[in-house]
Amino acid sequence: MHEHDSHGEAAHSNSEDMQMIHQHHEHHGHEEEHSAHHEKMKHSADHGDHHRMMMEDFKKRFYVSTLLTIPILILSPAIQTFLGFRVEFAGSLYILFLLSSAVYFYGGYPFLKGIFDELRRRQPGMMTLIAVAISVAYFYSSAVVFGLKGKFFFWELATLIDIMLLGHYIEMRSVLGASRALEELVKIMPSEAHLLKDGEIVEVKVENLKPGDKVLVKPGEKIPVDGIVVEGESFVNEAMLTGESKPVAKKPGDTVIGGAINGEGSLVVEVEKTGKDTYLNQVIELVRQAQESKSRTQDLANRAALLLTVIALTVGSVTLAIWLAYIADFAFAIERAVTVMVITCPHALGLAIPLVVAVSTSLAAKSGLLIRDRQAFERAKDLQAVIFDKTGTLTEGRFGVTDIVGFNHSEDELLQIAASLEARSEHPIAAAIVEEAEKRGFGLTEVEEFRAIPGKGVEGIVNGRRYMVVSPGYIRELGIKTDESVEKLKQQGKTVVFILKNGEVSGVIALADRIRPESREAISKLKAIGIKCMMLTGDNRFVAKWVAEELGLDDYFAEVLPHEKAEKVKEVQQKYVTAMVGDGVNDAPALAQADVGIAIGAGTDVAVETADIVLVRNDPRDVAAIVELSRKTYSKMKQNLLWATGYNAFAIPLAAGVLYSAGILLSPAVGAILMSLSTVIVAINARLLR
């Protein structure tokens, strides 16, 4: 939509359609300020600067044109008659003509240039209408100055251009907020880093860092790159990047994201990713692609805007002809035609959707919800069913204690004894029991004569008594019968360990893949908005049934092999518009098959090819957030399209003079004010999306 400078297409920080906002200008040349790998990140900032430069240009043209309009108003006979004074001297008419010419060519330049850009692309729109309207008024008035019979429209022309310039300036200010989110992401990144080299700290530009370098991050500083902590411990604030509200604890071996804010500890970070591979750059690229991708709704709005332009030009011409035939007053007929063209607002139609998209994709990105496919995001509003992969999505993918049953010991005693014995074991079950004891604040008791029983469990003396923590297989070997409560736990697919005291069963501890605390809230939120919740798992049916009952799922599919997941999704699709939620690795075909594929828990690796939407955090509640945002986005689009269509349907006949007999007639200046307001309303409504 623009003449592009050396930055090319990549310079766009928002939708191609967003360029309608400022299609009346060329890019100003930018200096290349960074090396190639840092360049894309700066493009959106450059584009924002360019947008601001254009705003300033409109403001400057508005001020100059307004100053020139003052003498035009004073010298205009119509204004003199209205205000009851007379200013006339030799050549005053020619001075009026020269001042009006200056306003037409200087103030009207963006619109005059815009018509050539639009016609060259064969996409007449807003600029075409304004340019035709001011040109008709200017050349007709000029002809009157040089002998044609009639009245001139110089003061109307000048005020019309002033209002158009001001309207576009206000509109661009309103719109800038939509495209500012990407610039904010870019601003997060620090420009310098403390490189550790030969035992010394060297200040270097971030773009000069390479994988393997080690950088020092001091307390309160922003982390300059994606990397791995090799020294130090701290809490890191990632809220601006992933939407994670609480600071995240970081220790050696943990990954950190460039742009996150370090807490009170110092960290030494080994550089892992630079340039376009960094998390932030990938997010910026995904948001840019989402904002530039077209959707059916947008195509419809674009066609409607083009059609509206043709209608306005046609109605303007017909209005001119009808009024000429009706009252044979050429000046009056010209004024009606000009008003029709300036009051029509294809801009409001053209911006109705891209503005909302720019706001919603940016809002989503800041919350760690990355939209890769805009059409899929729009489909999310129609979802009827969501299928979750179990392991790592609804559950944590690791053992946790779910039940403790004591026969002659309290739960707390049993847990403390079991944890004390298991503390020396590396087994995942042992780790889960110790973790549960720590969580409940129990200290470990000293164990004497500790011994591991290979493949069966552990034993030792605690508080003078011999205890064992053993598997069900060992219990069978001993010929010990278990009661109903134990059998019930087994039927739920849980792993059960027995605690024996002096050879007798004192109690059992049941463990299972731990259900995420957020899963219950996520499922209840989705069900509250009328969406059926289902689960796919390769796990056995007992485990699947237990998880489904715990979470209140509508249905579940157990013992499904990875290659069968896509088939199950297809089955559900026969009844419902379906989303699939998984980690994007072993369920890639299922994500691709679903109407909306959602990869969850992507962390810093956001380039999940098969997913339409990527959720950075491992939080199922974000699925409900995506559906809600999709519905709100669609609602805003509808509001904007309804407003833009309704406004034009009402304004065009009014401008043509259908209520002339009732004494209602709009001047071109009033038409221009209404047109500007209609676009600003669309922009403000889009920004109200939350």
Swiss-Prot record:
Localisation: Cell membrane
Record-level GO BP terms: copper ion homeostasis
Binding, Mg(2+): D583, D587
Keywords: ATP-binding, Cell membrane, Copper, Copper transport, Ion transport, Magnesium, Membrane, Metal-binding, Nucleotide-binding, Phosphoprotein, Translocase, Transmembrane, Transmembrane helix, Transport
Membrane topology, as annotated: Multi-pass membrane protein
Compositional bias (Basic and acidic residues): 28-46
SUPFAM superfamilies xrefs: Calcium ATPase, transduction domain A, Calcium ATPase, transmembrane domain M, HAD-like
GO CC terms, sorted: plasma membrane
Extracellular side: 86-91, 149-151, 325-336, 662-663
Protein known as: Copper-exporting P-type ATPase B
Organism of this sequence: Archaeoglobus fulgidus (strain ATCC 49558 / DSM 4304 / JCM 9628 / NBRC 100126 / VC-16)
